[in-house]
Design a protein with these regions (language model features):
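Conserved alpha-helical substructure of the radical SAM core
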Residues: 37-68
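SEC14/CRAL-TRIO lipid-binding/transfer domains and related phosphoinositide-recognition modules
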Residues: 2-7, 26, 40, 54
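Fold-independent oxyanion-binding glycine-rich loops
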Residues: 6, 37, 73, 123
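Conserved AdoMet/S-adenosylmethionine-binding subsite of the radical SAM
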Residues: 55-67, 76-163
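Short, small-residue-enriched loops and turns at beta-alpha junctions
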Residues: 42, 74-76
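A secondary-structure boundary/capping signal
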Residues: 23, 71-72
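Canonical Radical SAM [4Fe-4S] cluster-binding loop centered on the CxxxCxxC motif
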Residues: 16-49
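Short, charged low-complexity linear segments at domain edges
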Residues: 1-17
Length: 163
């Protein structure tokens, strides 16, 4: 899987855990406020980190790191995501997935396979304002609603944050 960034230590991205964060490239939204716009708009530019560099870090930091946060961009668009998550889990790490919720079938597959210990779904705005907020005119929020239901009924820890 193409890894577009790696934060080797975070105390913020996986609540209550010492973790690292893996960044994927590409996204199916065009949010005007995106804080990772370079990963979204130009995923082929910039840093590309070999998977083996991630796994070397995870091996070296066993007993220090507790989990891995996978974020983006939109990780569910990344080819090889589920394989990467499985390898991380095999090493004994917890996995947190950040998603925009646009791919409910992918979210369900990940949950059903036991690949995520926590899922943080970024709900961008009220359903009525989603098109403006996500940068896609006329966006149908049905996949967002479906992902919310899948996550909430899964038994997996959802991450909830409200300002």
């Amino acid at each position: 899987m193409l890894i577009h960034g790696l934060q080797k230590l975070t105390l913020l991205d996986y609540p209550g855990k010492v973790a690292c964060t893996v960044f994927t490239g590409g996204c199916n939204f065009r949010c005007p406020f995106c804080h990772n716009a370079s990963l979204v708009l130009r995923p082929d530019e910039g840093e590309h980190i070999p998977e083996e560099e991630l796994f070397a870090l995870l091996k070296k930091r066993q007993g220090v790191l507790e989990g891995v946060c996978i974020t983006g961009g939109e990780p569910t668009l990344a080819f090889g995501l589920e394989t990467l998550m499985a390898r991380i889990k095999e090493m004994g790490y917890l996995v947190k997935l950040d998603t925009n919720g646009t791919r409910p079938k992918a979210v369900k597959r990940i949950i059903d396979a036991g690949l995520a210990d926590m899922i943080a779904m970024d709900i961008k705005n009220s359903y009525e304002k989603y098109p403006e907020t996500c940068g896609i005119s006329g966006y149908d929020t049905a996949p967002i609603k479906e992902s919310i239901q899948i996550i909430m009924s899964s038994g997996i820890d959802p991450m909830t944050f409200a300002p």
